[in-house]
Swiss-Prot record:
This is N-alpha-acetyltransferase 11. Residues 1-58 are annotated as: Interaction with NAA15. Its EC number is 2.3.1.255. Residues 214-229 have a biased composition (Low complexity). It is found in: Cytoplasm; Nucleus. Keywords: Acyltransferase, Cytoplasm, Nucleus, Phosphoprotein, Transferase. Displays alpha (N-terminal) acetyltransferase activity. Proposed alternative catalytic subunit of the N-terminal acetyltransferase A (NatA) complex. Pfam families: Acetyltransf_1 (PF00583). PROSITE patterns: GNAT (PS51186). The modification Phosphoserine is found at S186. Residues 175-229 are annotated as: Disordered. SUPFAM superfamilies: Acyl-CoA N-acyltransferases (Nat) (SSF55729). It comes from Homo sapiens (Human).
Length: 229
């Protein structure tokens, strides 16, 4: 399974995945809008045959008086590839890209009040908090929870990893002990290794604004089903 940045020629297959998984669907111009405006923020999951089995469509909110923050427009994983943690990986990758490219402080999304599996994913796995209820947010009149995830902890972790890389180390995990003694790494503490220059790599549910509401009623999750809007 591979997670990678979405390319323009992925958009048709992302739309197809959306149609299979979610009741909130978008015209192709909406995918193009995201892809052209924020090409760094949307990701796809593909299987061993290169077929798209999940995606996250994301953007930055354009509110000049607010702190920089991102928004998850849509997240879906095909039924055949659920319970593999793909939704969490897609969400984390999009959030990291928001921090690295736009210095985002938090990320937001909307989810149907009735979508218990997605709420479980966002609240229990990804640490989103409900910020408010938006009445009749969806085209069928259902209310949405507006949710936010603070990105300061992830930003600190990314800075730490960058500092380690600058010092000549590659981080092998997300919460490793940063201390080494001499050139020896003990089994219980360090999860960093000296870089090898030869092998180092470079590098929601919706209406259309009130044409379009986003769909984050995820159809996947490490636990059950994920989706967002």
């Amino acid at each position: 399974m591979n997670i990678r940045n979405a390319q323009p020629d992925d958009l048709m297959n992302m739309q197809h995945c959306n149609l299979l998984c979610l009741p909130e669907n978008y015209q192709m111009k909406y995918y193009l809008y995201h892809g052209l405006s924020w090409p760094q923020l949307s990701y796809i999951a593909e299987d061993e045959d290169g077929k798209i089995v999940g995606y996250v469509l994301a953007k930055m909110e354009e509110e000049p008086d607010d702190v920089p923050h991102g928004h998850i427009t849509s997240l879906a994983v095909k039924r055949s590839h659920r319970r593999l943690g793909l939704a969490q990986k897609l969400m984390d990758q999009a959030s990291r890209a928001m921090i690295e490219n736009f210095n985002a402080k938090y990320v937001s999304l909307h989810v149907r009040k009735s979508n218990r599996p997605a709420l479980h994913l966002y609240s229990n796995t990804l640490n989103f908090q409900i910020s408010e209820v938006e009445p009749k947010y969806y085209a069928d009149g259902e209310d949405a929870y507006a949710m936010k995830r603070d990105l300061s902890q992830m930003a600190d972790e990314l800075r730490r990893q960058m500092d380690l890389k600058k010092g000549g180390y590659v981080v092998l995990g997300s919460r490793e002990n940063q201390e080494t003694q001499g050139s020896t790494l003990s089994d219980s503490e360090e999860a960093c290794q000296q870089k090898n220059p030869a092998t180092e790599e470079s590098g929601s549910d919706s209406k259309e604004p009130k044409e379009s509401v986003e769909s984050t009623n995820v159809q996947d999750s490490s636990e059950s089903s994920d989706s967002t809007s």
